Amino acid sequence: MYFCWGADSRELQRRRTAGSPGAELLQAASGERHSLLLLTNHRVLSCGDNSRGQLGRRGAQRGELPEPIQALETLIVDLVSCGKEHSLAVCHKGRVFAWGAGSEGQLGIGEFKEISFTPKKIMTLNDIKIIQVSCGHYHSLALSKDSQVFSWGKNSHGQLGLGKEFPSQASPQRVRSLEGIPLAQVAAGGAHSFALSLCGTSFGWGSNSAGQLALSGRNVPVQSNKPLSVGALKNLGVVYISCGDAHTAVLTQDGKVFTFGDNRSGQLGYSPTPEKRGPQLVERIDGLVSQIDCGSYHTLAYVHTTGQVVSFGHGPSDTSKPTHPEALTENFDISCLISAEDFVDVQVKHIFAGTYANFVTTHQDTSSTRAPGKTLPEISRISQSMAEKWIAVKRRSTEHEMAKSEIRMIFSSPACLTASFLKKRGTGETTSIDVDLEMARDTFKKLTKKEWISSMITTCLEDDLLRALPCHSPHQEALSVFLLLPECPVMHDSKNWKNLVVPFAKAVCEMSKQSLQVLKKCWAFLQESSLNPLIQMLKAAIISQLLHQTKTEQDHCNVKALLGMMKELHKVNKANCRLPENTFNINELSNLLNFYIDRGRQLFRDNHLIPAETPSPVIFSDFPFIFNSLSKIKLLQADSHIKMQMSEKKAYMLMHETILQKKDEFPPSPRFILRVRRSRLVKDALRQLSQAEATDFCKVLVVEFINEICPESGGVSSEFFHCMFEEMTKPEYGMFMYPEMGSCMWFPAKPKPEKKRYFLFGMLCGLSLFNLNVANLPFPLALYKKLLDQKPSLEDLKELSPRLGKSLQEVLDDAADDIGDALCIRFSIHWDQNDVDLIPNGISIPVDQTNKRDYVSKYIDYIFNVSVKAVYEEFQRGFYRVCEKEILRHFYPEELMTAIIGNTDYDWKQFEQNSKYEQGYQKSHPTIQLFWKAFHKLTLDEKKKFLFFLTGRDRLHARGIQKMEIVFRCPETFSERDHPTSITCHNILSLPKYSTMERMEEALQVAINNNRGFVSPMLTQS
């Protein structure tokens, strides 16, 4: 049973469906002058005007009573919709049939046909399962099972949502702006359209001449050619949208109705005023609403708490005569309440509004307390029961085929996958992330335990979903799929890095700027449990590509995409500090990457030595966050070697040019040679450094100790730097101050040496680093922070002066109100034998709870910055005259410190294991056995002195840079009377074949006590 009313009668007309015993009215739809009735047996009846073929049959111009549409009799029809003069029907297989007026393309049959009397299948949609359709006056919308929206028909106001310059369309077109968004509904009005997402976001497009899109802000357009997210509806909790000719009504989760648009007929439910624009609550409705529906110029609402059907607005005023039996009067203001008393013994099921006609379906069950709402067909998504069914199905069964079909659809559609894990909607502010990643992770884990499901998911992602990712969508709901995919185990399978992870990363890199910003905001809210696996997935793919070699242009493009995505993630993490920085380090790079080639490419590119049209290879150095400390030092070494080689090549070219042109002047040396006397070491070295040109520092450094036999080896320069720093950092030398006994050193507040000496000392430090040397420079970490433009902290002061740092910490921790009086603290300090006010008249300003943090901050700033400004700036200027700041900025302070001073984490057992044996020696040789036994008896200081004898330094490079080892040799000319000798640049120890422990211990002491100088190639016992 159903009720209808409209034109000539204020009374409800109670009707039963004719010609279909036992069938009830399931759905009704009305155009301007015709109606469709869909029955529960899936037959479609039509009545009204047929001048444009809108009844779906030939013959009479009008159908006074509802009659079946014969062309649809063989179909199981699930949905119907009416435009002004055209009709649509959807069968249970999702096929769409159209008939009626088609001059604007609104039938979607591929031609602008004036009239189509019989329903025709829309062939463009033949392979797509449509679950919803909605007709505007002259256009149509369809929603597919996989959440695609199609539009066709008239586009004079942009109501198709296809963008600018699109004419009317005779075939369905995808509304690409909505791709990836899990949708709940589509609704068409006169010349405007809406879509509602499962998250509750409303998207409107088309005509906005009367404000029917609810767009806000300055310069509101009169039409929109693309779907726009309607901000005014965002936080209302919209669950249903209905559109009239030029007005719109929305129903919220809490049973309220908001309307907007044209109000000339009172269709918005409040007094017509031109000032009221945007969504307005219909306050006159007394109770909670569960259904709404818009006619062209009026609105219906079912108030389930009172059992009333509320109607406001009226039919168009230009109608001159009755239309059909379902709407018998003209120009009638139907703003009234239809009482629950009219529905005796029945309960309202659904309401439907047309231009003139209104329908109410009922059911007999009056005991139900559940609010009857309109249940719309939904897009595909995974439910827990569905997942369990998939896991349980037997292979080759009917259920198995159905499961495969469901999996194929969901895992091929970004929107369906997102819909599967949406968080429960609320009526308040939207959550930071729309999807439940923990639920997704658990579901994917269960599903992929089944090999056939895992294989299907992989295929669907590779063939369809990754190609359909909404890279240019500005909507968070569409981009949520980028959060879900990394939760799936198949994305982490080592076999899938190239076919899944690389395309995924490329999609991120191809995003529009706006889309990427939205995605990055989502990344910023990720928990460690989601963010870390995402990073590990990318790292694993990069390693896999490197293991497969990076030769082709495509290989380089793959790595660029992976690194590009990691770069964006790194930016997000840096701003939010979710994960430690070293999470992004790819430790394997230190062994897999050729740093010389990589740095060379970067230098060539930066110096414009590569033609612009040449395909550029990936340069890992452009992504320094992937480098661990070892990789950064190797990159620094590569940079030094390349620059030395370039400098040497340039010098030889100049020499060649000089010879050819017979020039008188002697060309510059290809080496940077320092000739120094050991007795005047510092003076000689600083004099020559001050005379050097900037280009000299890029050359290979050669140090010659005058009157000594100095092989061109790293060992000589290592000893040079060791001796220079040892001398210049002594307290008695006067360049640096030591706040406490055994503490680190720092720049003095009132230096005794001239400022230039600090400049030269900075050059010396830079030269040591550039030449890959490590030296003992007892500076605190604060120095390396300052070199990298970072601010020293209280922790740095604790390192420089433990006692002072501890006392300042106590000041911060002290909760007493009279802290300044109790401790006699003022804004005046004593530092480096000077009394200093931290602020003007600081001696008279006590420290209290309100200013103690400022006091500590100014104390730290004075020590590390204010007091040393002049001398530190000279030091920094000298340091960066040699070293390139661009490459050092990639280091963290701790890493730069390690690169400069090395480490003293000695592993003497490993030292023994790493060692090699040549010229008749082997590990089991008696002399070797004696050596290690004697060596391990030495004190730590003696072992360090022996290390200096062997290598020219008593410190180690950063772990992994250089093996700590000895290469044992026994020249035939050696006798037991000879002492051991070393070749420092190669860690070679020439060890005579001693036969007793006493002789071995004696020889080691000689080496330890004569570990400096190059007077003779061999120390021989007299």
Curated annotation (Swiss-Prot):
Q: Which residues form the active site?
A: 985
Which Gene3D superfamilies does the entry link to? Hect, E3 ligase catalytic domain, Hect, E3 ligase catalytic domains, Regulator of chromosome condensation 1/beta-lactamase-inhibitor protein II
**EC numbers for this chain:** 2.3.2.26
Q: What is its main location?
A: cytoplasm
Q: Which GO terms describe its molecular function?
A: ubiquitin protein ligase activity
For this UniProt record, the keywords arranged alphabetically read as follows: Cytoplasm, Repeat, Transferase, Ubl conjugation pathway
Please list the residue ranges covered by the RCC1 repeats.
Answer: 41-92, 93-145, 147-198, 200-253, 254-304
The tissues in which it is expressed are: Detected in brain, heart, placenta and testis.
Instruction: Report the record's Gene Ontology biological process terms.
Output: hematopoietic progenitor cell differentiation; protein ubiquitination; response to bacterium; ubiquitin-dependent protein catabolic process
Q: Can you give the residue ranges of the HECT domain?
A: 693-1017
Protein's job:
E3 ubiquitin-protein ligase which accepts ubiquitin from an E2 ubiquitin-conjugating enzyme in the form of a thioester and then directly transfers the ubiquitin to targeted substrates.
Under which name does UniProt file this protein?
A: Probable E3 ubiquitin-protein ligase HERC6
Can you name the source organism? Homo sapiens
